[in-house]
């Protein structure tokens, strides 16, 4: 049986996450009281109609504070039943959450006459602290639109073929912000930039003209070898420490050329020695 617990601050994309999981065969329960988590898991296990139970539940700040405080004990109880249980935590920066609430005109679950929206958003982080501390996967949705979020959820949650650490190697452009949910970040802006070659500007690091140009640069090859040596040594240590998810981000200026090229190469070589290696290009349209 597989269970995914979805949590996060209001406006971060929890409803979208449940929609994606439901579309892919999960039985979803929104706003489950944390105290009922072990009972729900037990009932799903004994339900003979479910050959391979897939269960997703949303637990967030609408819970009683006392239930959230007991979340670590509830999670231990679920996992003691040999259930593969992942905790997904979604978040976005405060300005983005404020903007989303302003656009939808929805009421924040913690807002009151004496508590502003900004205060409610900040208080939510404190309430969800026990879940944040135990999250296996954190996704920051600040720079993601609806379709990008759906794709990210499918890649990280549904393309994980077996238990163990899932490694995501992600290219990005610094001009759109650094991915705050990355565990390791490599800055490759010091490398020769194909953008300044007019004949290469409209190509990406996935296309042969850019590949040929970058593969001929000694600095690029040296950077690749250094990053690969580091990851090849230390990623198995992450896996040995029972981490469920590790994100490695490779950044250049725009996220179209250098970071894409290196991310593709690293993904190809690391897939030969590690299981569950995924590649994503955040800023390629």
Curated annotation (Swiss-Prot):
Keywords: ATP-binding, GTP-binding, Nucleotide-binding. PANTHER family: RNASE ADAPTER PROTEIN RAPZ. Displays ATPase and GTPase activities. This is Nucleotide-binding protein PSPTO_4456. GO terms for molecular function: ATP binding; GTP binding. Pfam families: PapZ_C, RapZ-like_N. The keyword Disulfide bond does not apply. GTP binds at residues 60-63. Signal peptide: none annotated. Belongs to the RapZ-like family. SUPFAM superfamilies: P-loop containing nucleoside triphosphate hydrolases (SSF52540). It comes from Pseudomonas syringae pv. tomato (strain ATCC BAA-871 / DC3000). ATP binds at residues 8-15.
